[in-house]
């Protein structure tokens, strides 16, 4: 049985704000098989966390394993994925549902909360995605934020 370990992290500068995701996929011996670093526009931190998980699960599917251990530093996501907390945000419900569909592909699934120090590689990738986003991407993210704020004034 082939097993994978998936570390995922999302970062947002502002909540919502410019956001990025980071993913590290390892085999059971700790060898890095894949890394993902992607700017995802203007999102909340929790949206970014779920999007990192989803992107990680999609990348992991390419490796074709029977078992996966997901390690996240977001207690909220861990509790929601385990069914211990309800998902109240309408922004997060479809993301959680998508993650569950992707997790169902595996015969064995583990979901663990880890301290930030054990998720540093994914965190670095998420922040690097924001840091290296083009000026156009960042401007678009800021413009979206300003448009939404102006809607509140009406």
What do the PLM-derived regions correspond to, one by one?
Residues 11-15, 54-126:
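RNase H catalytic domain
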Residues 27-30, 45-49, 56, 90-94, ...:
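Short, surface-exposed linear patches
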Residues 1-5, 31-34, 39, 61-64, ...:
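Intrinsically disordered, low-complexity regions
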Residues 1-47, 51, 58-66:
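RNase H-like nuclease fold core
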